[in-house]
């Protein structure tokens, strides 16, 4: 487990800023397309921006949890790099979806793939820590010795 989590914290703050920016874009779209709260329907242009932001919000807890677990229990630098790619994928997704529903696919697939990888790395790291802590078996150390 990493003693210093500064890289994970930096990616977390950056991703929080991205979420805030997406929310701001929904506010701007509400003004532009004259959709007043609490309404969430209106022009297709507004609905795409709103839906893109909502999807990002829906996936955000999964991202934060898997980012930190992969960083703490697997490798902070690798998890940080994956986190930055995830943020880029969400950027592609949001702006693609804002233009046309079909343009969201690339960003969605990229960010979903990164989430799957972060989940896998976190699970592997947690499993290794569990085995080391409770069974005195460190798979990662044994693998490092082999290579």
From Swiss-Prot:
Q: Where in the cell is it found?
A: Endoplasmic reticulum membrane; Microsome membrane
GO process terms (BP): glutathione biosynthetic process; leukotriene biosynthetic process; lipid metabolic process; membrane lipid catabolic process; positive regulation of inflammatory response; response to lipopolysaccharide
Pfam families, per database record: MAPEG (PF01124)
Q: How is its activity regulated?
A: Each monomer can bind on GSH molecule but only one subunit is catalytically active.
- Does the record's keyword annotation contain Cell inner membrane? no
- According to its UniProt record, in which tissues is this protein expressed? Liver, spleen, skeletal muscle, heart, adrenals, pancreas, prostate, testis, fetal liver, and fetal spleen. Very low expression in lung, brain, placenta and bone marrow. Abundantly expressed in human umbilical vein endothelial cells (at protein level).
Q: Say if the entry is tagged with keyword Membrane.
A: yes
- Cited Gene3D superfamilies: Membrane associated eicosanoid/glutathione metabolism-like domain
Keywords carried by this UniProt record: Endoplasmic reticulum, Leukotriene biosynthesis, Lipid metabolism, Lyase, Membrane, Microsome, Oxidoreductase, Transferase, Transmembrane, Transmembrane helix
Q: How does it sit in the membrane?
A: Multi-pass membrane protein
* GO cellular component terms attached to this protein's record: endoplasmic reticulum; endoplasmic reticulum membrane; intracellular membrane-bounded organelle; membrane; nuclear envelope; plasma membrane
Catalytic activities: RX + glutathione = an S-substituted glutathione + a halide anion + H(+); 1-chloro-2,4-dinitrobenzene + glutathione = 2,4-dinitrophenyl-S-glutathione + chloride + H(+); leukotriene C4 = leukotriene A4 + glutathione; (5S)-hydroperoxy-(6E,8Z,11Z,14Z)-eicosatetraenoate + 2 glutathione = (5S)-hydroxy-(6E,8Z,11Z,14Z)-eicosatetraenoate + glutathione disulfide + H2O
Query: What EC designation does it have?
Result: 2.5.1.18, 1.11.1.-, 4.4.1.20
A GO molecular-function annotation: glutathione transferase activity
For this UniProt entry, which segments traverse the membrane?
6-26, 59-79, 111-131
Query: Its function?
Result: Catalyzes several different glutathione-dependent reactions. Catalyzes the glutathione-dependent reduction of lipid hydroperoxides, such as 5-HPETE. Has glutathione transferase activity, toward xenobiotic electrophiles, such as 1-chloro-2, 4-dinitrobenzene (CDNB). Also catalyzes the conjugation of leukotriene A4 with reduced glutathione to form leukotriene C4 (LTC4). Involved in oxidative DNA damage induced by ER stress and anticancer agents by activating LTC4 biosynthetic machinery in nonimmune cells.
- Report the family membership: Belongs to the MAPEG family.
- Subunit comment: Homotrimer.
This one is known as: Microsomal glutathione S-transferase 2
Source organism of this protein record? Homo sapiens (Human)
């Amino acid at each position: 487990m990493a003693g210093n989590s500064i890289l994970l914290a930096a990616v977390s703050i950056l991703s929080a800023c991205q979420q805030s920016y997406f929310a701001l874009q929904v506010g701007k779209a509400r003004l532009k397309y004259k959709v007043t709260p609490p309404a969430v329907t209106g022009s297709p242009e507004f609905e795409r921006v709103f839906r893109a932001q909502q999807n990002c919000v829906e996936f955000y807890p999964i991202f934060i949890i898997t980012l930190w677990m992969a960083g703490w229990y697997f490798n902070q630098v690798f998890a940080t790099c994956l986190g930055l790619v995830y943020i880029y994928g969400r950027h592609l997704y949001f702006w693609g979806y804002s233009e046309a529903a079909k343009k969201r696919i690339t960003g969605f697939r990229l960010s979903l793939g990164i989430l799957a990888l972060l989940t896998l790395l976190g699970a592997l790291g947690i499993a290794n820590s569990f085995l080391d802590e409770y069974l005195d078996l460190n798979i990662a150390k044994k693998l490092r010795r082999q290579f």
